[in-house]
């Protein structure tokens, strides 16, 4: 749903005049609604790793400790990396991390290096120990702060600039969040709306993008690891 359609829908539900346009409007009420929707979207984007704002980045390794600014590697509004997703696709091996400050300093103070590469993000840089081999293809997933998509389908952003901008987060949650924020600004009772909203956010985060089945007995079911497999019964005993 576009930004314009969302605010028009909200106005109909709330009994407010329905605007013909939002972006660039000088109507104080319309300007406020756009600002509140942006506030809601930014806050909701920080609540979890929504699949709609999760992206993959690829990087060609260089033979130095610093691989460069993380925002230059993950270029679409980098917010944070998803742990344990960096892989060296050339060697088919994980890049371990992010490690803590303590582990990193222990690595730097060690007389030996390796054998596994480990990383952390410090000062906005992706740094790796030991120094990796150049020209390997690395890939990882990250969560973006850009929750808005332009009509061209390729430009992602954090703030609205056109009525045709669409939103990458659950529409009903954005609508519910806009409702309680608007009531708060108007000095109306918003406690129940906010409580319902929070419950729906938690429920949506639990289902967003699908979730793996957790096995308490450590059996993965359909994705067995390589190794020797022993049948659970019907053993041939001499």
Segment roles from a protein language model:
Residues 1-238:
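Glycine-enriched, solvent-exposed interface loops adjoining structured elements
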């Amino acid at each position: 749903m576009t930004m314009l359609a969302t605010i028009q829908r909200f106005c109909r539900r709330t009994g407010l005049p329905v605007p013909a346009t939002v972006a660039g409007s000088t109507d104080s009420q319309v300007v406020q609604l756009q600002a509140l929707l942006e506030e809601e979207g930014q806050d909701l984007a920080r609540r979890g790793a929504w699949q709609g704002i999760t992206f993959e980045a690829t990087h060609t390794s260089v033979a130095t400790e610093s691989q460069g600014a993380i925002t230059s590697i993950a270029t679409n509004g980098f917010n944070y990396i998803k742990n344990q997703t960096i892989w060296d696709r050339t060697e088919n091996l994980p890049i371990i991390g992010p490690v803590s400050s303590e582990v990193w300093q222990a690595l730097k103070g060690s007389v030996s290096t390796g054998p596994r590469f480990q990383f952390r993000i410090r000062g906005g840089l992706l740094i790796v120990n030991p120094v990796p081999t150049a020209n390997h293809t690395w890939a990882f997933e990250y969560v973006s702060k850009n929750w808005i998509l332009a009509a061209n389908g390729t430009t992602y952003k954090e703030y609205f600039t056109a009525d045709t901008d669409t939103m990458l987060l659950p529409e009903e949650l954005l609508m519910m969040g806009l409702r309680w924020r608007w009531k708060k600004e108007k000095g109306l009772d918003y406690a129940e709306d906010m409580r319902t909203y929070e419950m729906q956010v938690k429920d949506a985060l639990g289902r967003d993008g699908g979730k793996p089945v957790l096995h308490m007995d450590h059996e993965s079911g359909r994705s067995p690891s390589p190794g020797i497999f022993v049948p659970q019964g019907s053993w041939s005993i001499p």
